[in-house]
């Protein structure tokens, strides 16, 4: 039994030690924001998209390189030909070459074709250049999308952080309320047993203890709920967190001023502007489709055949040997330039240019709308922050008065100078005042978060106040 008890004590000690270690490390808000940006799967997905667009930009730059084609073909067949015309619809005609013979025969031999082909777009009148720029614009848009996704995640993480902090503070308030209720019950129960007060007072005091315990349990449920939310945003397993007391013991300094209403650098606006720039670049690319293309080409070719050069005079002058037909008997080269211009594109692509211009116009209008909404949201946040400051000052007055009233009613009840109803009302008032105080203090930070999110700058929230 002694050994078993030692094992139990050791196990409990390990659990307590792990719990203490878990609570010993304070999770600061700036650290939480960093961890969310690194671990959240949605952010990882956006980073992969950015990498994909980076590779697309590299591919577009590689379009400056020439097309170089190497090919080797070996075949076996006849070379019967006749005079006449034909059109090879949907593909190439037969590659057999010969003069027409007097009659059909089925002589067959091996043949071969080897060639190297180079085609280089020397001058595309800006088409490839604009394709590269469009690829770079898409990459910038993907980066802007990643940044706004990180910003939105960090706003949600900050809200979850503050909500968890508020729930922890409310749990602490309910624990203090439970302690007061238990002290009150012990005092009432002892006096009731002594016959100084009716037994019903002790029963009511016991009910108050149960009610306080219920409120404490419900407050802990909220702590667990917001802990889960924060853990999800951090990309971690469910756990409890010890948060920075800065956001529960102080309020931010008053930063309201006209200079703090700039929203031009908001990540959402930056993303929308990058979409506008991408659309403008698409306009430039579409315009180049109306222009000609100048290219250089070169071909080096070698051919072999099992048919001899005098086959037309002597139909037996051929060999069915594979090695005879796959060698190179003749070679040719070809060099030149090609200037191609589909002149109907001058008319055809006018509609495509106008189409893209309308897309650009739509994106600009969306940008203007978003800018107005963020400006309005910023002004609203400033007003709400000012109200939060004022409300917090009022809750301090409320809490001070409730604490004084509770102490007075406690003294009066202990001396039999007030009723149980008056005392419990003072107890309720103090609990409500403590809750209002904690909520009002947290609301100041929540209002500051709203201001930071509307202006696109979370440093307003994370800087030391």
Go through each PLM region and give its residues.
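Periplasmic alpha-helical coiled-coil/stalk elements that build and connect Gram-negative outer-membrane
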Residues: 152-267, 430, 437
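Short flexible linkers and secondary-structure junctions
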Residues: 26-159
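Acidic, low-complexity, intrinsically disordered peripheral segments
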Residues: 2-3, 9, 69, 78, ...
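Bacterial Sec-pathway N-terminal export signals of envelope proteins
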Residues: 24-80, 122, 237-238, 243-282, ...
């Amino acid at each position: 039994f002694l050994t078993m008890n030692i094992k139990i004590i050791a196990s409990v000690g390990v659990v307590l030690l792990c719990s203490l270690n878990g609570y010993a490390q304070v999770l600061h808000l700036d650290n939480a924001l960093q961890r969310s940006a690194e671990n959240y799967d949605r952010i990882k997905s956006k980073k992969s998209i950015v990498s994909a667009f980076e590779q697309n930009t590299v591919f577009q730059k590689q379009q400056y390189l020439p097309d170089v084609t190497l090919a080797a073909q070996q075949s076996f067949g006849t070379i019967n030909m006749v005079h006449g015309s034909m059109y090879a619809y949907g593909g190439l005609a037969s590659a057999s070459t010969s003069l027409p013979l007097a009659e059909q025969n089925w002589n067959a031999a091996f043949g071969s074709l080897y060639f190297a082909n180079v085609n280089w777009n020397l001058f595309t009148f800006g088409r490839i250049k604009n394709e590269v720029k469009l690829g770079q614009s898409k990459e910038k848009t993907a980066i802007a999308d990643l940044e706004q996704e990180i910003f939105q995640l960090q706003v949600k993480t900050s809200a979850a952080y503050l909500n968890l902090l508020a729930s922890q503070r409310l749990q602490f308030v309910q624990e203090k309320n439970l302690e007061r209720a238990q002290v009150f019950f012990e005092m009432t129960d002892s006096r009731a047993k002594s016959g100084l007060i009716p037994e019903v007072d002790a029963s009511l005091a016991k009910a108050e203890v149960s009610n306080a315990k219920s409120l404490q349990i419900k407050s802990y449920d909220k702590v667990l709920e917001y802990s889960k939310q924060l853990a999800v945003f951090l990309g971690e397993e469910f756990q409890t967190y010890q948060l920075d007391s800065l956001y529960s013991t102080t309020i931010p300094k008053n930063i309201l001023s006209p200079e703090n209403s700039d929203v031009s650098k908001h990540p959402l606006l930056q993303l929308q502007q990058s979409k506008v720039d991408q659309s403008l670049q698409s306009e430039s690319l579409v315009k180049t489709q109306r222009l000609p293309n100048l290219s250089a080409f070169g071909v080096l070719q070698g051919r072999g055949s099992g048919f001899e050069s005098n086959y037309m005079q002597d139909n037996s002058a051929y060999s069915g040997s594979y090695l005879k037909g796959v060698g190179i008997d003749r070679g040719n080269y070809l060099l030149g330039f090609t200037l191609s211009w589909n002149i109907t594109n001058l008319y055809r692509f006018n509609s495509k240019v106008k189409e893209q211009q309308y897309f650009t116009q739509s994106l600009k209008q969306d940008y203007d709308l978003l800018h107005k909404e963020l400006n309005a949201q910023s002004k609203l946040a400033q007003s709400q922050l000012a109200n939060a400051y004022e409300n917090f000052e009022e809750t301090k007055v409320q809490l001070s008065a409730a604490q004084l009233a509770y102490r007075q009613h406690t003294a009066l009840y202990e001396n039999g100078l007030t009723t149980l109803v008056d005392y419990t009302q003072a107890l309720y008032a103090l609990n409500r005042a403590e809750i209002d105080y904690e909520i009002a203090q947290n609301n100041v930070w929540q209002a500051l978060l709203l201001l930071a999110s509307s202006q696109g700058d979370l440093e307003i929230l994370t800087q030391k106040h």
